């Protein structure tokens, strides 16, 4: 088994960041859930949906960064593998959201590099704190992401089945990741940590909708 040096890990981290931040750099491994449905939207509806999907894309950028940061500092090999596998599955979400934004003639958030950097640091710190807290961080993150997705599903125009199919599959995956993290030994995070996570999430949501 190959031993990765600090330089190897640094190069890998840089590669992961580029794949998460550069449009078109990530390809989905699973079929896009929206491929079998159509959606015709008016100008205002399309603009609103683009804002929602931009927020969801930024959320997936954050998820990638969290998992990458946690995988870097996780102590147990099985936990590290869990983080790496979750990141791979989240890549599908990243690609699906980006595809939908292209269909809507819109763009990903200009603030994504900031969200990636913040989330990567938070993930690495969670890993340093210990695997049970790292897994707890995953569980809480996925819980909050699921709440956002459910809210966005309620905001979608009734005729937008393409976005709906994508968000429904994403929500199913997020809940599965949360369950897996808890089953692996994740613990509930301190209240102050959860409040901080919520505040950062709200800031990301409000800004990425427009930028």
Swiss-Prot record:
Its EC number is 1.14.99.60. Its cofactor is Fe cation. Keywords: Cell membrane, Iron, Membrane, Metal-binding, Monooxygenase, Oxidoreductase, Ubiquinone biosynthesis. The keyword Manganese does not apply. Fe cation 2 binds at residues 90, 142, 174, 177. The keyword Membrane applies. It catalyses: a 5-methoxy-2-methyl-3-(all-trans-polyprenyl)benzene-1,4-diol + AH2 + O2 = a 3-demethylubiquinol + A + H2O. GO terms for molecular function: 3-demethoxyubiquinol 3-hydroxylase activity; metal ion binding. InterPro entries: COQ7_proteobact, Ferritin-like, Ferritin-like_SF, Ubq_synth_Coq7. Binds 2 iron ions per subunit. One of its GO terms (biological process) is ubiquinone biosynthetic process. Pathway: Cofactor biosynthesis; ubiquinone biosynthesis. Transmembrane segments: none annotated. Fe cation 1 binds at residues 60, 90, 93, 174. SUPFAM superfamilies: Ferritin-like (SSF47240). One of its GO terms (cellular component) is plasma membrane. It is a peripheral membrane protein. It is found in: Cell membrane. Belongs to the COQ7 family. Catalyzes the hydroxylation of 2-nonaprenyl-3-methyl-6-methoxy-1,4-benzoquinol during ubiquinone biosynthesis. This is 3-demethoxyubiquinol 3-hydroxylase. It comes from Acinetobacter baumannii (strain ATCC 17978 / DSM 105126 / CIP 53.77 / LMG 1025 / NCDC KC755 / 5377).
């Amino acid at each position: 088994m190959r031993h990765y040096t600090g330089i190897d890990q640094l190069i890998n981290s840089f590669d992961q960041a580029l794949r998460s931040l550069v449009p078109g750099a990530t390809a989905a491994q699973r079929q896009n859930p929206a491929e079998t449905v159509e959606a015709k939207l008016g100008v205002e509806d399309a603009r609103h949906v683009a804002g929602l999907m931009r927020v969801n894309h930024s959320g997936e950028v954050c998820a990638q960064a969290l998992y990458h940061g946690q995988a870097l500092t996780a102590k147990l090999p099985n936990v590290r593998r869990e983080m790496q596998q979750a990141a791979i599955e989240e890549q599908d979400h990243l690609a699906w959201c980006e595809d939908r934004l292209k269909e809507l003639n819109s763009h990903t958030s200009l603030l994504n590099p900031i969200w990636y950097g913040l989330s990567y640091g938070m993930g690495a710190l969670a890993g340093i704190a210990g695997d049970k807290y790292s897994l707890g961080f995953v569980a809480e993150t996925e819980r909050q992401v699921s709440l956002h997705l459910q809210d966005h599903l309620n905001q979608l125009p009734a005729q937008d089945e393409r976005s709906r199919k994508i968000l429904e599959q994403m929500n199913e995956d997020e809940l599965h990741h949360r369950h897996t993290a808890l089953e692996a030994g994740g613990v509930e995070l301190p209240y102050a940590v959860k409040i901080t996570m919520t505040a950062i999430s709200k800031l990301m949501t409000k800004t990425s909708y427009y930028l």
